[in-house]
Amino acid sequence: MKASVYDFTLKELSQLLKPSFRAKQLYLWLYAKYKTSFKDMQNNFSKDFIAYLEREFTLRTIEIAHVRKSIDGSKKYLFKSLRDNHTFEAVLLKMKDKKIDEETNAILEGEKYTVCVSCQIGCQVGCTFCFTQKGGFVRNLKASEIIQQALLIKEDNNLPIEKALNIVFMGMGEPLNNLDEVCKAIEIFNTGMQISPKRITISTSGVADKIPILAGKNLGVQLAISLHAVDDKTRSSLMPLNKKYNIECVLNEVRKWPLEQRKRVMFEYLLIKDLNDSLDCAKKLLKLLNGIKSKVNLILFNPHEGSKFERPSLESARMFADFLNSKGLLCTIRESKALDIEAACGQLREKKLSQQI
């Protein structure tokens, strides 16, 4: 089976293609001009070279299978692999609307978008609050499949080539359990799509022994830790992984994470009604994170069919956040997006699979 050309870093292509400057030309066709056929690259490639590319490589290996649009402008994408027909998800989040001068119609500030990408089909971690775990683990995604999620979403929304995106590895799968492909994708996002590592966030459930491996790669990305509880008993009930990597183990590795000036490690905390949303939990969280340059991102549980958990009130979330902020721990409440379109991780995929049975 031919490899996808999207699986290769610029350095790898420079070693494969002769002369080596062909690699940069090919990258421009792929990531600056969105060409999806080698024949469309004839302007500066000879027929013989195009024949070589067609013989050695393939291009697109995934396609959009389904899209759902939210009333808030967000979109949930279901992608299908063209090789094995397995499906996985990504989400386009519209973070800010365009600002226009009412008198001149000049664009003062463009829209801001975040793409939430998947790195695995299914997940091995098995978090009880997450819809993805229902389908079990299928396989890791290749770097090319991660990259194509962002490319296809940009194309589908007619976003300008130069439009910068934020990339968050918060879709299906645990990034640190597919670290090689995730790191390769990050390099290609940077050199190919011109997305700065500062715009990329890796969210992990806390695979503690791989955090220093990621740190050692010096990628310059942001780190987010899915914490979700302030004691091991509660966290283990939500995240079985905690039985192997408990809170103390994870935080010990986080303390060693290299931080640029003015940067913080993000801690994601899923608020679940009557489980971890009390003021007492907020006090314990403050104590846990003492000495760590951090930011807490509160997420209100996104209800889905079959879950025993409930969404807390916005009032309780504000009390939680206000307490932490009053004590000097930066805390925000994540704005809920796409609640009307099965945006919970794995929800759209599971729905489509159920319809096929």
Curated annotation (Swiss-Prot):
Q: Quick one: which residues bind S-adenosyl-L-methionine?
A: G173, E174, S203, S226, L227, H228, N302
Which InterPro entries does the record associate with it?
Answer: Aldolase_TIM, Methyltransferase_A, RlmN_N, RNA_MTrfase_RlmN, rRNA_lsu_MTrfase_RlmN/Cfr, rSAM
Catalytic reaction equation(s): adenosine(2503) in 23S rRNA + 2 reduced [2Fe-2S]-[ferredoxin] + 2 S-adenosyl-L-methionine = 2-methyladenosine(2503) in 23S rRNA + 5'-deoxyadenosine + L-methionine + 2 oxidized [2Fe-2S]-[ferredoxin] + S-adenosyl-L-homocysteine; adenosine(37) in tRNA + 2 reduced [2Fe-2S]-[ferredoxin] + 2 S-adenosyl-L-methionine = 2-methyladenosine(37) in tRNA + 5'-deoxyadenosine + L-methionine + 2 oxidized [2Fe-2S]-[ferredoxin] + S-adenosyl-L-homocysteine
Record CDD domains: Radical_SAM
The active site of this protein is located at E89 (proton acceptor), C345 (s-methylcysteine intermediate)
* Co-factor remark: Binds 1 [4Fe-4S] cluster. The cluster is coordinated with 3 cysteines and an exchangeable S-adenosyl-L-methionine.
GO cellular component annotations of the record: cytoplasm
Mark the transmembrane ranges: none
Chain residues that bind [4Fe-4S] cluster? C123, C127, C130
Q: Tell me, in a sentence or two, what this protein's role is.
A: Specifically methylates position 2 of adenine 2503 in 23S rRNA and position 2 of adenine 37 in tRNAs. m2A2503 modification seems to play a crucial role in the proofreading step occurring at the peptidyl transferase center and thus would serve to optimize ribosomal fidelity.
The record's section on PANTHER family has: 23S RRNA METHYLTRANSFERASE, RADICAL SAM CORE DOMAIN-CONTAINING PROTEIN
Q: What is this protein called?
A: Dual-specificity RNA methyltransferase RlmN
Taxon lineage:
Bacteria, Pseudomonadati, Campylobacterota, Epsilonproteobacteria, Campylobacterales
